[in-house]
């Protein structure tokens, strides 16, 4: 009887541990309602092949990462020609001549006869629908390869992991997280660092409902397109019918595209911390509709690049911000600045685009730097 009781107690404890493993909290903003793998029994991959299999199959899954999955050498290397469009100094990125990019777009750039890079990084791991990818503590790392949520995949959660070291010297060597024709995606408490090109990119097809929250885009790098140790290729939102909430993120030590917004993208940027950006943060092209409130900018050369071809409501002052009440049910929050450039444009037509949609909460910008630095990124759930 004692043995039976022990077994029952052990089984109960195991069941409790399993049920506790998985996603923490819930998404705010446009990805509200995302469930990922839901209540599926967690799986714990132990090899890179097993991780790829779990991410790409058709089952609803909660995938717990407990270690570093290093893809750097899993597919060997490739050698090709390239170019140096941003300079030949040791701190400048080089570009792989992928799809004849150098030939077609940078014909006058110095040529590089031989570039050797890791093949695995160029194309991310396919993530199918109904997946939760969750790191355990600070242990869950995907190194040398990114993730791709594309071609109709939906209902995906990526939480508490790091994606690092994807051919950082070479543009076109790979992106950390790619979405293209996806829906209901929540990226939360994710750290990205030392990436070839985009840390997060939403391609030209529609990515309907996306929330990027509490994440760290770490731009510190030995190789940069601006040759200054600040990564240029940050977040690129270019979809044909995209709704993106960015909240509580830490954008650090970058020099551009933080984010670049165009195509037909509605962006709510709220309570983010932009810090030590030698260059520009926002870049708003045609079809980019941005409402930015309650953000903090510290040592940011240009919070937004000029000219603005899309529309921006920058929550410029208390009186103007009252106009948010008709849609948000509250006034918008003023942004905060320290040793930063100007950020003031009031395209109030942007406000009405949020009507009937899930809108994230907003807090005072003055409190954001301390809060974000304590909470954004992997290991800070």
Curated annotation (Swiss-Prot):
Disulfide bond annotation, renumbered to this chain: 83-102, 92-227, 324-332
One GO process term, biological-process aspect: pectin catabolic process
Cross-referenced InterPro entries: Pec_lyase (IPR002022), Pectin_lyas_fold (IPR012334), Pectin_lyase_fold/virulence (IPR011050), PEL (IPR045032)
Pfam families: Pectate_lyase_4
UniProt-annotated catalytic positions: 257
Reaction(s) catalysed by this chain's protein: Eliminative cleavage of (1->4)-alpha-D-galacturonan methyl ester to give oligosaccharides with 4-deoxy-6-O-methyl-alpha-D-galact-4-enuronosyl groups at their non-reducing ends
Single GO cellular component term: extracellular region
Stretch forming the signal peptide: 1-20
Localization, UniProt: Secreted
Glycosylation sites: 130
Keywords: Carbohydrate metabolism, Cell wall biogenesis/degradation, Disulfide bond, Glycoprotein, Lyase, Polysaccharide degradation, Secreted, Signal
Lineage: superkingdom: Eukaryota
Keyword Secreted: yes
GO molecular function, one term: pectate lyase activity
Protein's job: Pectinolytic enzymes consist of four classes of enzymes: pectin lyase, polygalacturonase, pectin methylesterase and rhamnogalacturonase. Among pectinolytic enzymes, pectin lyase is the most important in depolymerization of pectin, since it cleaves internal glycosidic bonds of highly methylated pectins.
Protein name: Pectin lyase 1
Species name: Aspergillus oryzae (strain ATCC 42149 / RIB 40)
């Amino acid at each position: 009887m004692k043995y039976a009781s022990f077994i029952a107690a052990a089984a109960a404890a195991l069941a409790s541990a399993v049920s506790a493993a998985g996603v923490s909290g819930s998404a705010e903003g446009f990805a509200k309602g995302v469930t990922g793998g839901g209540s599926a029994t967690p799986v714990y991959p132990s090899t890179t092949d097993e991780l790829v299999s779990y991410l790409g199959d058709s089952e609803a899954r909660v995938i717990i990462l407990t270690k570093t999955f290093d893809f750097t050498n899993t597919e060997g290397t490739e050698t090709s020609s390239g170019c140096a469009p941003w300079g030949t100094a040791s701190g400048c990125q080089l570009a792989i001549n992928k799809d004849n990019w150098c030939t077609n777009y940078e014909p006058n750039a110095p040529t590089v006869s031989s570039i050797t890079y890791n093949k695995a990084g160029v194309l991310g791991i396919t993530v199918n629908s109904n997946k939760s990818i969750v790191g355990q503590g600070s242990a869950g790392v995907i190194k040398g390869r990114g993730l791709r949520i594309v071609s109709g995949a939906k209902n995906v959660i990526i939480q508490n992991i790091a994606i690092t070291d994807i051919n950082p010297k070479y543009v076109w060597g790979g992106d950390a997280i790619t979405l293209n024709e996806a829906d209901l995606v929540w990226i939360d408490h994710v750290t990205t660092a030392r990436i070839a090109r985009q840390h997060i990119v939403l391609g030209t097809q529609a990515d309907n409902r996306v929330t990027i929250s509490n994440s760290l885009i770490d731009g510190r790098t030995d190789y940069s397109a601006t040759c200054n140790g600040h990564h240029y290729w940050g977040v690129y939102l270019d979809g044909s019918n995209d709704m993106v909430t960015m909240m509580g993120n830490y954008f650090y030590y970058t020099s551009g595209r933080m984010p670049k917004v165009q195509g037909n993208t509605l962006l709510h940027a709220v309570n983010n911390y932009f810090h030590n950006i030698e260059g520009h943060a926002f870049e708003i092209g045609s079809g980019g509709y941005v409402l930015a409130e309650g953000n903090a900018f510290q040592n940011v050369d240009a919070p937004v690049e000029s000219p603005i071809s899309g529309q921006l409501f920058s929550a410029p002052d208390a009186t103007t911000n009252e106009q948010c009440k008709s849609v948000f049910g509250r006034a918008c929050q003023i942004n905060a600045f320290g040793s930063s450039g100007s950020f003031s444009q009031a395209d109030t037509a942007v406000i009405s685009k949020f009507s009937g949609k899930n809108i994230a909460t907003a807090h005072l910008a003055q409190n954001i730097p301390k809060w974000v630095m304590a909470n954004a990124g992997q290991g800070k759930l």
